[in-house]
Amino acid sequence: MYISDLQYSSPAMFTTELQRKVYEVLEILKIPFVRVSTDAAISMSDCKLIDEKLDMQMVKTLFLTNAQKSRFYLFVTCGQKAFDSKAFSQALGCSRVSFAPTGFMKEKMGVTVGAATVFSKLLDDVDAVQVVLDKDVVSNPWYGCSDGTTTGYMKLRTLDVVETFLNHIKHVPKVITV
């Protein structure tokens, strides 16, 4: 798998509108990051080499919905954790959830499978998606995620994501223990 050298600035060209917005907001908020460009990485196993290059653990970002497909959640957990729908639902106090259909992911978050990111909230003008953070992610000093593509990954301080970015977009995440 191709992984670029570490880079400390935005890409020269953007492949999606979301990717452009991600780097714009990082610049506006003065949030430092280090990033790499890669071949397409879809699964968590694809991310292992990226983790090594960035010296951190990539988060796993899951797009979930209830049975009626009327509530949507962006669940950010540790990359190595298995997802337990029952434990998630109990911790959040909601009905059982499942993975949202990919069409909803594109419609609500502006991304395809493998590119889900907390930064997708930049496209969620109607606040249709609730960000849910695993307490273990919040307690980690580093946050590794996609830049809204399957070929761009970055490392930032978790506090910059949870406090600075989410406060900037006026979204209050729910933090749960699973």
Describe the residue ranges of each PLM region.
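Extended, low-hydrophobicity, polar/charged segments
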Residues: M1-V178
